[in-house]
């Protein structure tokens, strides 16, 4: 990874060739490093003879740079770092860009740093050949700091504009399966120019440098495209720096612990359903209609996840601005509840297990003190006769087994049937056959 710029390999030239195609698809690829995540799958599908073309390009480039000159392979390996030792240093882009932008010098500076989390929803995603890839319909943004939690939030619905011909059903289906915002005649929608102006006022109310904006890496292409589209519609030009939340979390961990966590762990940290239905998380319209997908909720849940994971590491007392306290306290409490999928099997294991011997005598005592009948689990009914039952399928199998056993005993018995004796499970055996 650190030597990628120093030694361009076949994959580098393959990615470089794919950049124009990625830009036509609306992806934010300004350089090769940005395009690498989008090309790995296509590279894996190439045959060896197809990859040879790019390997040849890499060899020609190294020859032009003078890296292939020399009498032996050993001299080539030694001469490269001696000639350009600076290339062995990792690229600045590997560390999250927010760390340099904020000029973090201490934990106190990190705690006081202001972060903006942004998300924009769309009525689906149109095919790559369409000029309009997304139709923005909702925007949410929160102002956050580790010290104060969520300080302010911004939310608005957006008029998506004219639906491209032939894609109305596609857009309606995408809306119905997620945020359920109407694709037309929505009374709460605002024009894109007004929404963008209000967003800029929220993010940058005072003169000075514009703060960086963060969103999830999976949403970055859509959010960036929608911002550019809204800028063209409103004729307002502001080059917002759109970064990823994953890089922000990695940077905070690096600053605090001098270690870099894996991106997989960071994504699992942010993708939780703990606060999906928490109060004051979704916008008013989605809350009233009981709809889970909301752009504002995505931003707030990012803040909740960061607070839950990072704020305590800095000794910060969590408040209602950091996480929904009622849900946070409930999640940390232990509920004495157990779900048993096969009650009959579980009861059998408990009786046979030596660790539950004292429960065995207790259960027998309870059987003699409870009445016959079916009652919900956990309900105790006093009565003369009762038996502990399993699930319905368990009782059915037991009855079939008992019936077959009784028939077998009847056919093989030469003497008269013994007097009726109640069975342990409450079922009567066959006493006569017609």
From Swiss-Prot:
GO annotation, biological process: apoptotic process; cell morphogenesis; DNA damage response; ectopic germ cell programmed cell death; fertilization; gene expression; homologous chromosome pairing at meiosis; intrinsic apoptotic signaling pathway in response to DNA damage
Keyword Ribonucleoprotein (UniProt): no
Highest rank taxon of the organism: Eukaryota
Tissues of expression: Testis-specific. Present in spermatocytes and round and early elongating spermatids.
DNA-binding region boundaries: 4-73
Disrupted-gene phenotype: Mice are viable but show profound defect in synapsis of homologous chromosomes in male meiosis, piRNA production defects, DNA demethylation of LINE-1 (L1) transposable elements and a 100-fold increase in L1 expression in the adult testis. In the adult testes, L1 transposon derepression occurs at the onset of meiosis. As a result, spermatocytes are flooded with L1 ribonucleoproteins (RNPs) that accumulates in large cytoplasmic enclaves and nuclei. Spermatocytes with nuclear L1 RNPs exhibit massive DNA damage and severe chromosome asynapsis.
SUPFAM superfamilies named in the record: HMG-box (SSF47095)
InterPro entries registered for this protein in UniProt: HMG_box_dom (IPR009071), HMG_box_dom_sf (IPR036910), Maelstrom (IPR024970), Protein_maelstrom (IPR039259)
Localization: Cytoplasm; Nucleus
GO cellular component, one term: cytoplasm
Keywords: Cytoplasm, Developmental protein, Differentiation, DNA-binding, Meiosis, Nucleus, RNA-binding, RNA-mediated gene silencing, Spermatogenesis
Gene Ontology terms for molecular function: DNA binding; RNA binding
Entries under Gene3D superfamilies matching the protein: High mobility group box domain
Primary role: Plays a central role during spermatogenesis by repressing transposable elements and preventing their mobilization, which is essential for the germline integrity. Acts via the piRNA metabolic process, which mediates the repression of transposable elements during meiosis by forming complexes composed of piRNAs and Piwi proteins and governs the methylation and subsequent repression of transposons. Its association with piP-bodies suggests a participation in the secondary piRNAs metabolic process. Required for the localization of germ-cell factors to the meiotic nuage.
Quaternary state and interactors: Interacts with SMARCB1, SIN3B and DDX4. Interacts with piRNA-associated proteins TDRD1, PIWIL1 and PIWIL2. Interacts with Tex19.1 and, probably, Tex19.2.
Family assignment from sequence similarity: Belongs to the maelstrom family.
Listed name of the protein: Protein maelstrom homolog
């Amino acid at each position: 990874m650190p030597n990628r710029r120093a030694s361009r390999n076949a994959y580098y030239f393959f990615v470089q060739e794919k950049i124009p195609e990625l830009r036509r698809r609306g992806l934010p690829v300004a350089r090769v490093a940005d395009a690498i995540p989008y090309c790995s799958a296509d590279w894996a599908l190439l045959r060896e003879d197809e990859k040879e073309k790019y390997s040849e390009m890499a060899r020609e480039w190294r020859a032009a740079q003078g890296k292939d000159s020399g009498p032996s392979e050993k001299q080539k390996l030694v001469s490269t770092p001696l000639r350009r030792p600076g290339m062995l240093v990792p690229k600045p882009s590997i560390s999250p860009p927010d760390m340099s932008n904020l000029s973090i010098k201490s934990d106190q500076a990190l705690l006081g740093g202001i972060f903006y989390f942004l998300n924009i929803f769309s009525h689906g995603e149109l095919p790559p050949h369409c000029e309009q890839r997304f139709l923005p319909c909702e925007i949410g943004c929160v102002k956050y700091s580790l010290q104060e939690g969520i300080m302010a939030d911004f939310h608005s619905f957006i008029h998506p504009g004219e639906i491209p011909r032939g894609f109305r059903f596609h857009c309606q289906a995408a809306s119905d399966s997620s945020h359920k915002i109407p694709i037309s005649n929505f009374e709460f929608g605002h024009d894109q120019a007004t929404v963008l102006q209000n967003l800029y006022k929220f993010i940058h109310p005072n003169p000075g440098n514009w703060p960086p904006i963060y969103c999830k890496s999976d949403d970055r292409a859509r959010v960036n495209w929608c911002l550019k589209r809204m800028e063209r519609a409103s004729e307002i030009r502001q080059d917002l720096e759109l970064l990823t939340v994953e890089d922000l979390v990695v940077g905070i961990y690096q600053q605090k612990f001098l270690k870099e966590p894996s991106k997989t762990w960071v994504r699992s940290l942010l993708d939780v359903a703990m606060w999906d239905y928490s109060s004051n998380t979704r916008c008013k319209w989605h809350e009233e209609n009981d709809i889970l997908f909301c752009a504002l909720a995505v931003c707030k849940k990012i803040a909740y996840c960061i607070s839950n994971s990072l704020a305590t590491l800095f000794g910060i007392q969590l408040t209602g601005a950091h996480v929904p306290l009622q849900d946070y306290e409930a999640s940390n409490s232990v509920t004495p509840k157990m779900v048993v999928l096969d009650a009959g099997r579980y009861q059998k294991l408990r009786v046979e297990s030596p660790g539950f011997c004292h429960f065995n005598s207790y259960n027998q005592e309870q059987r003699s003190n409870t009445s016959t009948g079916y009652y919900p689990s956990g309900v105790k009914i006093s009565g003369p006769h009762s038996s502990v039952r399993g699930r319905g399928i368990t009782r059915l199998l037991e009855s079939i087994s008992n019936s077959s056993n009784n028939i077998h005993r009847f056919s093989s018995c030469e003497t008269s049937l013994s007097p009726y004796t109640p069975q342990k499970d409450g079922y009567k055996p066959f006493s006569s056959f017609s």
